[in-house]
């Protein structure tokens, strides 16, 4: 299907209600609003998320009359996926069309595990200096169907053996484009679908929300959802974090750590422990005393530390710390009793590694299109 036909199809679909926008409670309300019983929502959700069915006529345990009604009123439509790329290490990346712009989604198969890295916004407003996404500016929050549709569509490809991945998606990480906590409502609705027994029925321990630390949203997150939490800290003090992450001038390290403690107090996911993400930048944040500072920051919080070798992108002056420096940094923390992992670089050759995701984004702040390849 060419883009003109696709856009015409999407215009027609916009007149219908996209059921991918509904978690179970919203689906029940919708079914009641069209004169149907609540339990029909459960039946339809199972068809959508456990049989990957987007054709109401194939939902054989509901009446023909209801199937016709749903076909008239509703659709099951994820965003369009283009430009499927496969890395030498097996990592896969897609461009995902959002209007006339696009985001990126990455699938990482490894042994018996398949991890999907999804985006939550079209662009990102945080402008972290070491991240390519942040250089593109921000356009909009993704809606629920655009978030859950990334998981649903790739899971459907695997389910029907349309791509060379054997195991279904076991882990979802919100580590793609955008800051999830700046799109809190839509992200939470999508997470509820992933967790629901009539939805994707995933474990909360296998879903990770990664945030730069939007403190007001982080403080109330526990009242809305319980999933594993990762926080992009990337510095051992506020001076460095201000340089790397402008959001730190609004929500400094101390306020972020306080919000983390509150979330962990209520959360049962991931053994009540936060993952601290720390990008390794040569001469910036990788000295031995930075490791000491990091330990002192975190010693009152149950945590594990994920050291991330920085991935180069054009136009950046940063340099990744070398392997010796990264290992020395890790060993300092390990000797103090920290759990430390060093992230393995996946998908670098197709620009699918951490910090490399881009797309086509119309930056609303500067009123221009940013397209980085």
Curated annotation (Swiss-Prot):
One of its GO terms (molecular function) is tRNA binding. Disulfide bonds join 117-354. Binds 1 [4Fe-4S] cluster. The cluster is coordinated with 3 cysteines and an exchangeable S-adenosyl-L-methionine. Its main location: cytoplasm. Reaction proceeds by a ping-pong mechanism involving intermediate methylation of a conserved cysteine residue. Specifically methylates position 2 of adenine 2503 in 23S rRNA and position 2 of adenine 37 in tRNAs. m2A2503 modification seems to play a crucial role in the proofreading step occurring at the peptidyl transferase center and thus would serve to optimize ribosomal fidelity. HAMAP family: RNA_methyltr_RlmN. This is Dual-specificity RNA methyltransferase RlmN. It comes from Buchnera aphidicola subsp. Baizongia pistaciae (strain Bp). The lineage of its organism: Bacteria, Pseudomonadati, Pseudomonadota, Gammaproteobacteria, Enterobacterales. The gene is rlmN.
């Amino acid at each position: 299907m060419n883009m003109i036909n696709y856009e015409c199809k999407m215009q027609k679909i916009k007149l219908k209600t996209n059921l991918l926008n509904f978690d179970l409670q919203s689906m029940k309300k919708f079914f009641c609003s069209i004169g149907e019983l609540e339990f029909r929502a459960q039946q339809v959700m199972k068809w959508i998320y456990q049989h990957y069915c987007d054709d109401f006529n194939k939902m054989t345990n509901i009446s023909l009359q209801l199937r016709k009604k749903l076909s008239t009123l509703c659709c099951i439509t994820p965003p369009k996926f283009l430009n499927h790329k496969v890395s030498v290490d097996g990592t896969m990346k897609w461009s995902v069309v959002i209007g006339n712009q696009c985001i990126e989604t990455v699938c990482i198969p490894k042994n018996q595990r398949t991890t999907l890295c999804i985006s939550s916004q079209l662009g990102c407003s945080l402008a972290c200096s070491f991240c390519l996404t942040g250089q593109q500016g921000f356009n909009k929050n993704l809606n629920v169907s655009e978030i859950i549709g990334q998981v649903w569509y790739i899971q459907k490809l695997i389910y029907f053996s349309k791509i060379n991945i054997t195991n279904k998606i076991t882990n979802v990480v919100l580590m793609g484009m955008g800051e999830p906590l700046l799109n809190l409502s839509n992200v939470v609705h999508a997470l509820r679908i992933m967790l629901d027994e009539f939805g994707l029925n995933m474990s909360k321990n296998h879903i990770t929300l990664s945030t730069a630390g939007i403190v007001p949203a982080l403080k109330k997150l526990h009242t809305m959802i319980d999933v594993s939490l990762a926080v992009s800290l990337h510095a051992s003090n506020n001076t460095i974090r201000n340089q790397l992450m402008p959001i730190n001038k609004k929500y400094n390290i101390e306020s972020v750590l306080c919000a983390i403690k509150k979330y962990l107090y209520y959360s049962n996911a991931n053994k009540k422990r936060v993952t601290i993400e720390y990008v390794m930048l040569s001469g910036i944040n990788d000295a031995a005393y930075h490791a000491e500072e990091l330990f002192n920051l975190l010693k009152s919080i149950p945590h594990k530390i994920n050291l991330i070798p920085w991935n180069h992108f054009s136009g950046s002056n940063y340099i990744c710390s070398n392997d010796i420096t990264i290992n020395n940094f890790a060993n300092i923390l390990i000797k103090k009793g920290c759990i430390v992992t060093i992230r393995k670089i996946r998908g670098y050759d197709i620009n699918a590694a951490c910090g490399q995701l881009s797309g086509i984004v119309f930056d609303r702040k500067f009123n221009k299109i940013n397209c980085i390849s």
